[in-house]
Regions:
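Catalytic histidine neighborhood in serine/cysteine hydrolases
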Residues: 447, 497, 501-536
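Short beta-strand/loop motif that positions the catalytic acidic residue
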Residues: 480-482, 486
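Conserved alpha/beta-hydrolase "acid-adjacent" motif
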Residues: 487-493
């Protein structure tokens, strides 16, 4: 191979590097073994993996012809590949039997196509990968859940085996190793040890240069102030940028699985700033990063201390008794619960409208996240929650990254640990790694009763503070925005949620995924969206009758707000400054809750400083 043609010109230096490499590897193994402690959650995942592959094996035993045909096809392809490799080694031209899919960035290095040896390795791997995928897909006697889980675990196995993940079969890494005389591997092992030490369970790879960003300094910089605080939230009121503002204020309810500033990363892509610039008086809930002390917080507590407390704060700050809601992800699920609760307690008028961004209310099809919610895995999570009082946000991040493992795990594994290079500075990836913990009382209930048992869609299926709620009784006008490629909140599931309220509903489908499709500023003119005034029972029928539009959905939403009368556009008032009402200025936005990291919550940062 091309990389192997280079000579090692200094054997003594190579010997020294191998000694250093050996010492780093030994230290890494000691670190790894020290983390090998009994873990109910990890054990439950292993049980689920065993169950999934056993189900697949039993399916193949019931259909031996499928196994035989698949093996025969793979052997035939391998023979053709061997003949091709022999011809290429003799200098002949060759046409590849298989090539990477369009979105596969692992094999972008030129050597994968120009070097016959590397090309043969790549094709051999792709043939195996495609065979496994096809085989699992043809196991039609498995239940949908069994097939989903087996497909996920098989994909994890196959992608872990990619030749790009190993030194000797990755041309980029081989070149780097020869150029640096192995220093890249020494540096990579050092980075791996550091990341392992900073991970709760599994491995949280470093995705970005974290020193390049500081919350409140160069991200989350929209001007405003914290005007209210309780044990769970800080309520931020943002400073106006227009002389007049809409009479009805706007409350943003973000998710608490991660931090709110994905909606306020930079001024040019900030949804918060855009809303303020349109004339909204924007309030936003900043959730506390919880620890063991918050273990008993319930879904009802999140509702009372979150949206309902925020409504009271907004009335004190502005004098307005109602507000518009703009919610996101699990924040939207909580908001839907809140709408039903307010309706049942005859306070539904406190919300003039409600918007759900990438939100699940009907959990019948959770997508691949369902892999983490099989009964063995869920029982393991519940045991861990009971033991610790919280779910470490780094564990959640690791799980979510495995839903896009090649982009969000293995690419950084190769860059950081095999090439020994620093990741680039990227604000979105900084946010992605700035996680939050999840309290036991809330998260365990959410996973069991909503994700697994889908009780929120049942009339009276959920009881909050003694009140049985029913989403079908909510008459508040609703705007649903789902995104076509969302792997967290699948758009078909979001659509089924839109069929629940009895009030007027507008459903819009955006392009792209869970983040980019939601945070899609108009000036970029990207992704597009679809609209359809009808709401048939089937999501595919809705899409077939939908009209495509270019650009961002944000202006469409703004037009819906104005034309619907939800902002009282004919009753503009003077701009409201934070602190201008009955609520005092507590501290500048974005506040301290959002700046609190997981290590700080758990006392790890202090321990590290003491060790130094």
């Amino acid at each position: 191979m091309a990389a192997g043609d280079q000579a090692a010109d200094n054997p003594e230096e190579w010997g020294n590097q191998l000694s250093v490499l050996g010492a780093e590897y030994q230290a890494l193994m000691e670190d790894f073994l020290s983390r090998m402690v009994p873990n109910d959650a990890a054990d439950s995942v292993m049980e689920d993996i065993r169950n999934s592959f056993q189900a697949g094996a039993e399916s193949l035993m019931r259909n031996p012809t499928l196994l035989w045909e698949t093996q025969a096809k793979l052997m035939q392809d391998q023979m053709a590949l061997w003949q091709q490799a022999m011809a290429a080694a003799s200098g002949g031209a060759f046409e590849p039997l298989v090539t990477p899919s369009r979105g596969d960035r692992r094999f972008k290095d030129e050597a994968w196509t120009s070097d016959p040896g590397y090309n043969a390795i790549m094709q051999q791997y792709l043939l195996f990968s495609n065979t496994v995928e096809t085989l699992v897909d043809k196991l039609d006697d498995l239940s949908p859940g069994e097939k989903r889980n087996l497909s996920f675990y098989a994909r994890q196995m196959v992608n872990a085996m990619s030749p790009t993940n190993f030194v000797s079969t990755n041309p980029e890494v081989m070149r780097k190793t020869l150029e640096t005389r192995g220093q890249n591997l020494v540096d990579g092992l050092s980075r791996l040890r550091e990341d392992l030490a900073n991970s709760a369970e599994g491995l949280n790879v470093t995705m970005t240069d974290r020193s390049a960003f500081e919350v409140g300094e160069n991200i989350a910089v929209s001007q405003g102030a914290v005007v209210m605080e309780n044990e769970l939230i800080q309520l931020i009121q943002y400073a106006p940028t227009t002389e007049k503002v809409f009479k009805t204020p706007l409350l943003i309810v973000p998710p608490w699985i991660n931090k709110f500033y994905v909606l306020d990363l930079r001024p040019e892509n900030s949804l918060v700033k855009w809303l303020v610039d349109q004339g909204h008086t924007v309030f936003l809930i900043s959730w506390r990063n919880p620890g063991p002390e918050q273990r008993d917080l319930t879904w009802a507590d999140y509702m009372q201390l979150g949206p309902i407390a925020a409504l009271d704060g907004i009335e004190q700050a502005t004098g307005e008794k109602s507000a518009n809601f703009l919610s996101y992800c699990i924040g939207g699920t909580l908001t839907a619960s809140t709408m039903a609760y307010l309706t049942s307690t005859r306070r539904g008028r406190k919300a003039k409208s409600v918007t759900y961004m990438a939100t699940l209310q009907d959990f019948r099809d959770p997508g691949e996240i369902g892999v983490f919610l099989s009964e063995p895995v869920l029982q393991g999570i519940e045991a861990k929650l009971e033991q610790d009082g919280y779910l470490d946000g780094r564990v959640m991040a690791y799980s979510f990254n495995l839903l896009r493992e090649n982009d969000l795990f293995w690419s950084f594994y190769v860059n950081n640990y095999l090439k020994g290079e620093d990741p680039a500075a990227f604000d979105l990836l900084y946010w992605n790694t700035d996680g939050t913990n999840l309290p036991a009382g809330t998260h365990g209930w959410y996973l069991r009763h909503l994700y697994q048992e889908n009780q929120l869609v049942e009339p009276g299926g959920v009881e909050l503070d003694g009140v049985k709620i029913d989403l079908r009784k909510v008459s508040t006008p609703s705007y649903f925005i789902a995104t076509k490629e969302d792997h967290i909140a699948k758009w078909n599931s979001s659509y089924y949620g839109a069929l629940l309220p009895k009030g007027p509903v507008t459903f819009v489908l955006g392009g792209s995924g869970h983040i980019a499709g939601v945070v899609n500023p108009p000036h970029k003119n990207k992704y597009g969206y679809w609209t359809n005034d009808e709401l048939p029972d089937n999501h595919e029928e809705w899409l077939a009758g939908a009209e495509a539009h270019e650009g961002s959905w944000w202006p469409h939403w703004q037009e819906w707000m104005v034309k619907g009368g939800y902002v009282d556009a004919d009753k503009m008032v003077d701009a409201r400054e934070p602190g201008g009402g009955e609520l005092p200025l507590l501290e500048p936005a974005p506040g301290r809750f959002v700046k609190t990291s997981i290590p700080e919550v758990l006392g790890e940062a202090e321990d590290d400083e003491a060790a130094e």
